């Protein structure tokens, strides 16, 4: 909303609330403003005219990616400095020219060991959880990866505190992928990958949605031929370690390797001990069993 300086109590709605578009940031410039957010779990950047409030949404070339504004310190500009990356595209900084949409690449993250993006593919899958909820999955593999269930897969998820897991570039994954693995990110409930409701649907009394989503994604990837039961590696730390503890007990036959780093697996006793310095601040996430 906006208001005139002389009438600060009178607000005009500029950008209405939306269940589809999850606003994460905005930036103001002289002739326009820019909104950043996610729709269906994918980053969206929109340039909006002050006078008409019409929006131009920028297009990005890959099915799964991370995109947004970079450093733009000037107020009166004709170009926007932006950044883009994906699971197969190293971090790229470019200028977007407002007049005609031309994109000038300024810098691409250097990979000292060498990297040929043409050898790899990234996809965005939708796998249906047991309650009918569609779960987005970002996946990376070599282009010659066979969908016959013969290959191992590394599956990552977090699903807590409203933290989205972005499908960005990571050099450490390439070693696994070059040795025949697929690498997948399950955008499970408990993060805010698809907005605040996505986060709320994976906390408190709905916490089991997070665990079920992760297991169902693993089973869905098996059904699609990306891997087989017993060939999935996974890991998680802290709240992600809690996820590891849950899934290795509920479906032990799915996993070939599970690493739980500093896992938060004694939730009940921790939430019952209010003398622990972190416990009261964690009650909104896990619940307060002392009172309820």
For each feature predicted by the language model, list its residue ranges.
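Glycine-rich His-Gly loop
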Residues: 85, 156-162, 203, 238
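Non-catalytic accessory segments flanking enzyme active sites
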Residues: 24-25, 36, 42-48, 52-149, ...
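Alpha-helix capping and helix-loop boundary segments enriched in small/acidic/polar residues
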Residues: 21, 68, 160, 164-167, ...
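Hydrophobic beta-strand anchors of alpha/beta hydrolase catalytic cores
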Residues: 152-156, 183
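Helix-coil-helix junctions within alpha-helical repeat/solenoid scaffolds
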Residues: 1-10, 16
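Surface loop/turn motifs at the tips and blade-to-blade linkers of beta-strand repeat domains
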Residues: 14-19, 59-63
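C-terminal substrate/ligand-recognition segments
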Residues: 21-40, 127-136, 162, 181-188, ...
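Active-site-proximal cap/loop segments of hydrolase catalytic domains
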Residues: 179, 185-292
